[in-house]
């Protein structure tokens, strides 16, 4: 195999996104070499491209983007025995580097030294060939497509968020933001027994998609609307009731505030979206009504559950993909994502395999 056949999407610095050939890596003992098939573009990929950083994570050297992927095992390291060439797998992008207190507690996503694809300085898998720890590659049932395998990553965010939110049978759930993560939270909320799910967004096209995918109510957020006005619309839609659990997926201050005002006393607000480092919130409202605010950082222990949910047809994530591009069209795909067109943009890394 020629050593220049690994086409990769590489971010050099802010606004400097390139397609380039890199050497095909060799798997270490506990790794597999994957021939990538489908990789979704995440908002964080675009944020790194546009800003060169997310918080303290700064792009200081060229980095391969992408952390929502699936592919086929091409080669296995000598220490790998549960996977073989030809196996179709979904990739969990976060791999603990050490067995610290967070790992011992089963919350390895909180480990400060975790390897995470496409978080500086760690390379992602928006490329044709990628090596990955075999224990974080999960076999896909024949009934699931590569695209569904790639969508397990954003689905995992929603599973973790809904777990953190304590959603159960009969819950009234508010979701702020109808992008990929908002839609995934809609699907998981309903699968976990929510009786009513209300979703808000600025874009009518996204709300239409949310309605098609099972939202009970949708609300179009107006640009000049106050957080109290939005929360009142939410209460009106719920027939005067308030949400048991609110899941904020935008990071926008207005939506965080509205989530607090629209959540019942003793309820839970889950913060999934990330935008600015800080936000003004009505702390008195939180305190006197005992609203629990819970953060979400990625996920942990979700891939097997997600695969079971998809294989059992408990949820259908396929309609989330609205745009597809070849790997060679990566820049166009990133521009499409940046414009907020559609929901999920998917890149196809293996043009010889048309199986979605």
Regions found by a protein language model. Give the residues of each.
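Glycine-rich beta-strand-centered segment in the early N-terminal region that forms part
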Residues: 25-39, 54-101, 141-143
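NAD(P)H dinucleotide-binding glycine-rich loop of Rossmann-like/cofactor-binding domains
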Residues: 97-176
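N-terminal Rossmann-fold NAD(P) dinucleotide-binding loop
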Residues: 182-183
